[in-house]
């Protein structure tokens, strides 16, 4: 009889130890899973906004490059019309972009000749979740302009280039990821389109 009681006591103690071990394992694994979930939330949001920036830049450049065959001019090759196309594309994401006009085009930090990223930190908006738009017009002779207030009335821009660049200060929302990357990360996308026209 004493042997049976002794076995029962040992089994009960063993079960209590197992429960404590399971609790520790769950605490460690749930912490790791929670950190992964927070990272996925911010990564998913960043991907969502980068896809919206990409689409808006493409839509703005395509809209500006369009050629009216009957009128023989580019009716949307100006700042206001391109910005309207960009903001219509970004409306679904709940963002409104701001046009930044400059005397010249946005100069990348690696000085590449086509105006692609990376861009200087000063070009990004200071406010979180804000978008700056830079439009660069290159005429057929290679002259670059940072602004075009009104569209051309003829076919002079044919085979030129319009480059629409969108730069965003993306706000991270999970505290742990903010601790790693800071308050936000810079997202940028630009799109070139050849300005259409007929000789």
Task: Specify the residue positions occupied by each region the protein language model found.
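A general structural-boundary detector
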Residues: 7, 14, 31, 40-44, ...
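Aliphatic-rich helix starts adjacent to a transmembrane/signal segment
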Residues: 17, 21-29, 34-71
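Short, conserved structural patches
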Residues: 2-7, 58-199
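N-terminal leader/signal peptides at the extreme start of proteins
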Residues: 1-19
């Amino acid at each position: 009889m004493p042997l049976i009681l002794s076995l029962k006591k040992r089994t009960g103690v063993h079960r209590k130890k197992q429960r404590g071990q399971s609790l520790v394992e769950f605490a460690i694994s749930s912490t790791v899973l929670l950190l992964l979930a927070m990272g996925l939330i911010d990564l998913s949001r960043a991907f969502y906004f980068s896809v919206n920036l990409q689409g808006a830049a493409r839509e703005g450049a395509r809209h500006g490059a369009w050629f009216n065959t009957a009128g023989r001019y580019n009716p949307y090759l100006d700042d206001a019309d391109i910005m309207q196309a960009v903001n219509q594309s970004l409306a679904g994401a709940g963002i409104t972009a701001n046009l930044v006009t400059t005397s010249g085009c946005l100069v990348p930090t690696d000085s590449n000749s086509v105006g692609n990223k990376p861009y200087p930190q000063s070009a990004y908006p200071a406010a979180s979740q804000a978008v700056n738009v830079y439009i660069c017009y290159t005429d057929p002779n290679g002259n670059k302009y940072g602004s075009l207030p009104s569209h051309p009335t003829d076919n002079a821009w044919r085979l030129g280039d319009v480059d629409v660049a969108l730069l965003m200060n993306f706000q991270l929302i999970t505290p742990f990821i903010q601790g790693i990357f800071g308050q936000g990360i810079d997202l940028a996308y630009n799109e070139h389109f050849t300005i259409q026209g007929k000789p």
